[in-house]
């Protein structure tokens, strides 16, 4: 495990949010981040996290809200759908999980899902996104051989 690489992906995955844009949905910040990192000379091993962190389970439909319902007409839709179809690396899965557990503090995935429901509402894909979030957490529990939350003592304060 390359810890510096994992940290770097964590630092840059949401870099597209630094740009101003009027479009709604996941695509704007994902694509702006991807293009920005590429413009700096980095390859897809780095830039790809800007896209892949927004979609669980290699599935363009696995999002936490329906703000992207109209994005099938987005110029980037086909590119993103194909791009995320490849198996995610362990690093990309770690960033997905961390993105789901962290806001201003570390949360259980259950509490993070409630946070997303509160802020975005319940949509057609919400149940699917919650199921995949729980599967991702269970994947890491299995990989570790114990409950992932044991790595985060501060989570006990949030239970």
Regions found by a protein language model. Give the residues of each.
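Divalent metal-dependent phosphate-bond-processing catalytic cores, especially two-metal-ion Mg2+/Mn2+ enzymes
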Residues: 1, 12, 22, 42-44, ...
């Amino acid at each position: 495990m390359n810890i510096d690489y994992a940290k770097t992906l964590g630092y840059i995955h949401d870099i597209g949010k630094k740009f101003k844009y009027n479009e709604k949905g996941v695509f704007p910040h994902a694509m702006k981040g991807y293009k920005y990192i590429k413009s700096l000379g980095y390859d897809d091993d780095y830039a790809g996290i800007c896209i892949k962190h927004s979609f669980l389970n290699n599935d363009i439909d696995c999002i936490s809200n329906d703000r992207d319902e109209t994005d099938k007409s987005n110029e980037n839709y086909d590119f993103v759908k194909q791009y995320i179809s490849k198996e995610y690396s362990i690093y990309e899965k770690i960033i997905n999980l961390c993105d789901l557990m962290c806001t201003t503090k570390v949360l259980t995935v259950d509490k993070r899902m409630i946070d997303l429901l509160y802020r975005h509402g319940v949509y057609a894909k919400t149940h699917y996104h919650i199921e995949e979030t729980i599967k991702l957490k269970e994947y890491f529990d299995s990989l570790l051989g114990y409950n992932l939350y044991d790595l985060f003592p501060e989570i006990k304060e949030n239970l």
